[in-house]
Regions:
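Hydrophobic cores of alpha-helical transmembrane segments in multi-pass inner/ER membrane proteins
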Residues: 2, 79-90, 143-155, 202-215
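Internal transmembrane alpha-helix with an interfacial aromatic "cap," most often the third helix
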Residues: 81-109, 152-159
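Terminal transmembrane helical module of multi-pass membrane proteins
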Residues: 156-232
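C-terminal ends of transmembrane alpha-helices
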Residues: 42-53, 57, 116-130, 174-192
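Interfacial helix-start motif at the membrane-water boundary
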Residues: 64-85
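Membrane-proximal helix-loop-helix units in multi-pass membrane proteins
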Residues: 116-157
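N-terminal signal-anchor transmembrane alpha helix
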Residues: 24-50
Length: 232
C-alpha cells in the first residue's frame, strides 16, 4: 500500500476532529448573543431598576440606570464588562459562521465593533443633574447606533428569505421607535420609556434570532476534508 494512501484515513480523521471542534466553538460563541440579550434585560429593568425607588420603567430612559448618581449603577458597571465580552464573542461567532459570504462577514466585524464600543459608552455616561455630560454621551451612543444599523443592514443583504425580511423589519422598528423616544426626551413620559424599550428590545431579539439562524447554517467542509473525500 502506498504511503500516501496509508496517511489518508488518519488525515481524514484529523480533519473531521478539527471540523467538530470548530463547529462546537462556533456554536458556543453564537450562544453568547442570546445570553447577552437576556442578561441585558435582567440587569437593567430587573436588578438596576429595582434598586431605584421611584424609577418608572414605562417613562424613563434605560440610560438613566447607567448614569453617574444612579442607585443601580454599581450593578451595571460590572455588567457592562460582561455584556461587552459576551457580545464580542457573539460577533466572532458570526464571523466564523459565514465563510464565503462577504456581507455577513462585514456584519460580524460590525457586531464585534459594536460590542467593543460599550467600553467607550462606559467612559462617557450620563451624570444625573449635569447637562454637560449629555453631548459626549449622545455622540458615543450615536456611533454605537451606527454600528448596529450597519450590522443589521449587512445581515439583511447577506441572507435571503425570512431572515432578510426579519432583519429589515427589526431595523425599521428599532430605528423608528428610537427616533420617537429621542423626540420625547428628556421626559419622563410614556413615549420615552416604552418607545426606547421597544427600540432596544427589537435589537436584542434580533440578536437571538440571528444566532439561531446561523446555528442551523451548515459550514462548508474544510479544504483538507474535501480533498480527502474526493480521493475516496
Amino acid at each position: 500500500m502506498p504511503i500516501a494512501e496509508g496517511r489518508q484515513p488518519h488525515q481524514g480523521r484529523a480533519a473531521h476532529t478539527r471540523s467538530v471542534r470548530d463547529g462546537t466553538l462556533r456554536r458556543v460563541l453564537l450562544a453568547a448573543g442570546p445570553v447577552s440579550s437576556l442578561l441585558y434585560v435582567v440587569a437593567t429593568d430587573g436588578l438596576a431598576a429595582s434598586r431605584w425607588d421611584g424609577y418608572l420603567r414605562s417613562e424613563q430612559m434605560v440610560s438613566e440606570l447607567f448614569a453617574v448618581g444612579s442607585p443601580g449603577r454599581d450593578v451595571l458597571v460590572p455588567f457592562t464588562w460582561l455584556y461587552t465580552a459576551l457580545f464580542v464573542a457573539f460577533g466572532a461567532g458570526v464571523w466564523n459562521s459565514v465563510h464565503g459570504n462577504r456581507a455577513l462577514r462585514i456584519a460580524g466585524g460590525l457586531l464585534t465593533a459594536y460590542g467593543l464600543w460599550n467600553i467607550m459608552g462606559a467612559l462617557y455616561p450620563l451624570t444625573l443633574g449635569d447637562e454637560t455630560s449629555v453631548p459626549m454621551h449622545i455622540l458615543a451612543t450615536n456611533i454605537q447606533l451606527a454600528l448596529m444599523v450597519g450590522a443589521m443592514c449587512f445581515v439583511a443583504a447577506g441572507f435571503h428569505g425570512r431572515m432578510r425580511w426579519y432583519s429589515i423589519l427589526s431595523l425599521l422598528a428599532s430605528a423608528l421607535m428610537g427616533m420617537v423616544a429621542f423626540m420625547a426626551a428628556p421626559g419622563p413620559n410614556l413615549v420615552l420609556g416604552i418607545g426606547e424599550r421597544i427600540s432596544i428590545g427589537a435589537f436584542l431579539l434580533w440578536v437571538a434570532v440571528l444566532a439561531v439562524a446561523l446555528w442551523r447554517r451548515p459550514l462548508p467542509a474544510p479544504a483538507e476534508e474535501r480533498r480527502h473525500q474526493s480521493a475516496r
